A protein has these predicted regions:
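Short, aromatic-enriched amphipathic alpha-helices that serve as compact interaction elements
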Residues: 1-15
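Aromatic side chains
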Residues: 7-8, 29, 94, 109
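A beta-strand edge to alpha-helix "cap/lid" segment located at domain peripheries
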Residues: 49-123
Length: 123
């Protein structure tokens, strides 16, 4: 199981805060979020406290992350996937990258999400 498969399984599970077990204390992140097909998007940046705040504020019911492609280069892992409603309907496509520390925890995290573009699913 890849890092992102483990991370998203915890994030989407009954205790989303358990995903923080895979996050380094000194994490830095940037989340690029496009809600629709317009040119407007939002960026969320911060550290572990801000990531916890996003989990606190997040609406995580009724949908989940699905990793379709992944790769590893040294201590960097990549994942391409989709968010889907529980019905299976696609919400959006995401591309995530993480630099892992020596303990395998996420040290740097960047993800972009858009509902506009879909890729063929491998899994």
């Amino acid at each position: 199981m890849t890092f992102f498969e483990r991370y998203f399984e915890l994030l989407d599970g009954p205790d989303p805060h358990s995903s923080l077990e895979l996050v380094a204390d000194d994490v830095e992140f940037s989340i690029q979020w496009a809600a629709d097909g317009t040119r407007k998007s939002r960026q969320f940046v911060g550290d572990r406290d801000e990531l916890r705040g996003l989990i606190d504020a997040g609406d995580t019911e009724g949908w989940a992350h699905y990793v379709s492609h992944s790769g590893v280069s040294g201590d960097v892992e990549f994942a391409l996937g989709e968010t889907r409603w529980d019905t299976g309907e696609r919400i959006g496509t995401f591309l995530a990258v993480a630099e892992l520390d020596e303990s395998g925890r996420m040290r740097r995290y960047m993800v972009a999400r858009s509902p506009v573009l879909a890729f063929p699913s491998e899994r």
